[in-house]
């Protein structure tokens, strides 16, 4: 697929961002392109708003897979680009439009240049939430099309085009959404002694939560608790009877995640006693760590370097969350960062990755699959 075609597809997809499990236009756009290929070369199955695509090998004995996430974010785009989002309040601010386009470029190559083994492509919805990887793994499709290896990438705005970065073992952290509700007795601002102020309770809790990191977490380990939103109260002269907190937890080990959650729940119990209120802690969405398979990852890095397909760098662990971790929990494989050189980072309303990165990615994966699927 020519570079100009990749860019045109990416811009089409960029115009129609949709959030998790609502990617109806996106799915249809992808199907319209995929259905143009000969039926003897590819097989297509849909799953909710996602798609499975099998590119048939000439004498298959195994199956290599590639996953591309397809959802967008609830962000009002501020790029001013001529192909900016046509859906107010939504934007491809995490590069999934490029991820999909790269997958299409790889598919196009192998439809026209068959290899021995089957290739499976997963267009996965809802990576940003509520999480599409884990339920997609339960699909009946993967009972008949079972990967022997699975791969994925994610754009990295901070890396130059022509660069990839990854490592064996832990790449991305365990992540969990955090929601806390505090319910007490409201009242008149002039009579605080007759009420239980949930704004004060929430404020106290937020500061206490940081002690879980500073005093309960091994200094040689890493963990993060971020409270991103607090809502409570209805007017300036009414003591709030309810407070709602939302945030995230990120850790580099499952053991740390269990410890952090246990301490959060203990601190909430303390708030219940101290402020005569009721507290509720929930974790709406939890993502397993991305843990690259040793051996396969080094082999991939060496292959890309030896064939000068990209500048290969060794990555550091990141506190980023990615539900591709569930796929790596089930199948061997790896994920890597793709340099996309943007002055604005992921989840930013002005993210504008360099489209030349797509050609690098297609060349890397075409080269890798051409060797290891033959």
UniProtKB/Swiss-Prot annotation:
GO molecular function: N-acetyldiaminopimelate deacetylase activity
Single GO biological process annotation from the record: diaminopimelate biosynthetic process
Catalytic activity: N-acetyl-(2S,6S)-2,6-diaminopimelate + H2O = (2S,6S)-2,6-diaminopimelate + acetate
The protein's Enzyme Commission number: 3.5.1.47
Keywords annotated in UniProt: Amino-acid biosynthesis, Diaminopimelate biosynthesis, Hydrolase, Lysine biosynthesis
Pathway membership: Amino-acid biosynthesis; L-lysine biosynthesis via DAP pathway; LL-2,6-diaminopimelate from (S)-tetrahydrodipicolinate (acetylase route): step 3/3
Lineage: superkingdom: Bacteria
Ranges that cross the membrane: none
SUPFAM superfamilies assigned to the protein according to its UniProt record, in alphabetical order: Bacterial exopeptidase dimerisation domain, Zn-dependent exopeptidases
InterPro entries listed in its UniProt record: AcetylDAP_deacetylase (IPR023905), Amidohydrolase (IPR017439), Bact_exopeptidase_dim_dom (IPR036264), Peptidase_M20 (IPR002933), Peptidase_M20_dimer (IPR011650)
Function comment: Catalyzes the conversion of N-acetyl-diaminopimelate to diaminopimelate and acetate.
Protein name: N-acetyldiaminopimelate deacetylase
Lineage: Bacteria, Bacillati, Bacillota, Bacilli, Bacillales
